[in-house]
Swiss-Prot record:
Family per record: Belongs to the FKBP-type PPIase family. FKBP1 subfamily.
Domain spans labelled PPIase FKBP-type: 26-114
Presence of the UniProt keyword Zinc in the record: no
Name of the protein in question: FK506-binding protein 1
Regulation: Inhibited by both FK506 and rapamycin.
Top-rank taxon, per record: Eukaryota
Amino acid sequence: MSETIEGGVKIDRLSPGDGKTFPKQGDLVTIHYTGTLENGQKFDSSVDRGSPFQCNIGVGQVIKGWDAGIPKLSVGEKARLTIPGPYAYGPRGFPGLIPPNATLIFDVELLKVN
């Protein structure tokens, strides 16, 4: 199942979560993710590091595409977020890693809402 939300962020649901525990603005979330460019080049992965990532969602700590997309997932859900440049790193990109205005693809698993 696929849906497109705010900012053109596309959510492809890969496996369901509990269907009832969704993060709200300001919640601390624990996520496993792998980020790739459209050409398939991996630029970051919490899975490879063996350490899940934590952030407060919806408060500007992460890219806008995560702030928009992660609250649509329930705990345990796996999804692919396709995030257009303006909702990723925008015109600055991330020097040496992510080109300016690049669309990013994240395979994410919402492990926990704290």
